[in-house]
UniProtKB/Swiss-Prot annotation:
GO biological process: protein modification process
Additional information: In the reaction, the free carboxyl group of octanoic acid is attached via an amide linkage to the epsilon-amino group of a specific lysine residue of lipoyl domains of lipoate-dependent enzymes.
Name this protein carries in UniProt: Octanoyltransferase
Protein family according to the UniProt entry: Belongs to the LipB family.
Site feature Lowers pKa of active site Cys, where: K176
Keyword Cytoplasm tagged: yes
UniProt gene name: lipB
Keyword Acyltransferase: yes
Gene Ontology CC terms: cytoplasm
UniProt xrefs under InterPro entries: aa-tRNA-synth_II/BPL/LPL, BPL_LPL_catalytic, Octanoyltransferase, Octanoyltransferase_CS
HAMAP family: LipB
Pathway: Protein modification; protein lipoylation via endogenous pathway; protein N(6)-(lipoyl)lysine from octanoyl-[acyl-carrier-protein]: step 1/2
């Protein structure tokens, strides 16, 4: 009797870019509220607002929200933060936060995008959601002729720096231009992403950003693009709508 030969199939882990499927809400869902803070927002106020908005979205009493802010100079420590990565603990205020990830810097000139979406309506896929946020950043950068890239071993968006000395292993230098850190409660996201437009890059020296050693941090202005925050906001919104669907303006 013929017995088919058993074939061993090696499972290859899916890459984050393979997880990008539709993150659109159902067709009858209202547009996502798009809100831009007109001035610097203190971090505790931002957390309180996110908590309140996320709870209302989960309860069905508020529409989804994307909130764009800038913060005064500060560090935040995610749930995986290692105290050794806070290199200069007295340089700036430090806030513990419930988002994933490690230490990061926020300050003027950095666009922080707090994303409060109901993934029950969209897709209950955390890795896919992170990949979608990366796609928003990559598309935003691409609209300004900057090539942003994802790395499987490093969440966030990176740019190659051929003009810099190579890394210790001989590979090309890379700098981080955008970070991502999220939290979910009842499948509603909060926290989000940050894109370096023109922050004080020296402030990143007080931490090991995101716990990743050996890599630098850059910004759009550092790359030679003297862009205005308002222009970046327009491009972010266009990229967001291509990935997540329509938005509507909400004034503060």
């Amino acid at each position: 009797m013929y017995r088919p030969e058993k074939i061993s199939i090696r499972k290859v882990p899916m890459q984050r870019e393979d997880l990008i499927q539709s993150m659109f809400a159902p067709p009858d869902a209202p547009p996502v509220r798009w809100r831009i803070a007109p001035s610097l927002v203190d971090y505790p106020e931002a957390v309180e607002t996110m908590e309140r908005e996320a709870a209302a979205i989960a309860d069905g009493t508020a529409d989804e929200l994307v909130w764009l802010v800038e913060h005064p100079p500060l560090y935040t420590a995610g749930t995986s933060a290692n105290a050794a990565d806070l290199v200069m603990p007295d340089l700036l205020p430090v806030f513990a936060t419930g988002r994933g990830g490690e230490y990061t810097y926020h300050g003027p000139g950095q666009r922080v995008v707090y994303v409060m979406l109901d993934l029950k309506r969209r897709r209950q896929d955390v890795r896919g959601f992170v990949a979608a946020l990366e796609s928003v950043i990559i598309a935003t950068l691409d609209s300004m002729n900057v090539k942003g890239e994802r790395r499987e071993d490093r969440v966030g968006v990176w740019v190659r720096r051929p003009e810099k000395p190579p890394l210790m292993d001989g590979s090309m230098a890379e700098d981080k231009i955008a970070a991502i850190g999220i939290r979910l409660r009842k499948w509603v996201s909060f926290h989000g992403l940050s894109l370096n437009v023109d922050p004080d890059l020296e402030h990143f020296g007080g931490i090991v950003p995101c716990g990743i050693r050996g890599y630098g941090v850059t910004s759009l202005v550092d790359l030679g693009l003297p862009v205005m925050m308002a222009d970046v906001d327009i491009r972010l919104r266009e990229a967001f709508e291509r990935v997540f669907g329509p938005t509507r303006t909400e004034n503060e």
